[in-house]
């Protein structure tokens, strides 16, 4: 019998290439048909390995989900970047590779990040999701998130409504 080893840890500079690949795959899966094609390609190209190398060295926490020494997910989080979510903590990004979705890894990553925020006095957490990303909205609702606000992003001349979720 073979068991699978899964860990959640801080990202390291050596993770830059796998994070760039993961970002490319997860964003294409999540946003194809939601974000206009040219804008999506531009965003993906901006998140190169070099960008991720810098992200591993910034003060905002970046953690990865590693399974059998492969990075299959990541999250970026920290103090809230705005006030609309009415929460002191915010998860900026949380993505799991499509082949690993539905296995509980996203839930586990969310809990780990939420616990880390709470350990730093940021017990109430907010997160934004594009309204058209039904899978993400269902994920956050399933975790107990309450939709508390709406806002818009603009990308390549397209208005992208987003919904804010809060967790207590």
Listing of model-derived features with the role each one plays in the protein:
Residues 141-149:
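Conserved acetyl-CoA-binding loop of GNAT-fold acetyltransferases
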Residues 2, 161-168:
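Terminal substrate-recognition subdomain of acyl/acetyltransferases
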Residues 2-6, 10-16, 20-99, 107-116, ...:
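Acetyl-CoA-dependent GNAT
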Residues 118-128:
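Conserved GNAT acetyl-CoA-binding A-motif
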Residues 127-136, 154-159:
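Conserved beta-strand-loop-alpha-helix junction that forms the acyl-donor binding cleft
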Residues 97-99, 103, 131-132:
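Active-site acidic-Proline motif in GNAT/NAT acetyltransferases
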């Amino acid at each position: 019998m073979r068991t699978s080893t899964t860990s959640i840890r801080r990202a390291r500079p050596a993770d830059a290439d796998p994070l760039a690949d993961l970002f490319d795959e997860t964003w294409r899966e999540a946003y194809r048909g939601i974000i206009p094609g040219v804008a999506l390609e531009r965003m993906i190209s901006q998140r190169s390995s070099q960008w991720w190398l810098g992200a591993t060295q910034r003060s905002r926490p970046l953690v990865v989900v590693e399974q059998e020494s492969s990075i299959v997910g990541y999250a970026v989080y920290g103090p809230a970047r705005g006030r609309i979510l009415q929460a002191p903590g915010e998860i900026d990004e949380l993505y799991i590779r499509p082949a690993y979705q539905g296995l509980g890894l996203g839930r586990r990553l969310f809990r780990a990040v939420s616990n880390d925020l709470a350990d730093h006095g940021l017990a109430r957490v907010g997160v934004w999701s594009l309204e058209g990303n039904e899978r993400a909205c269902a994920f956050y609702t399933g975790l107990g998130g309450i939709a508390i606000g709406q806002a818009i992003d603009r990308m390549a001349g397209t208005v992208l409504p987003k919904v804010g979720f809060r967790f207590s």
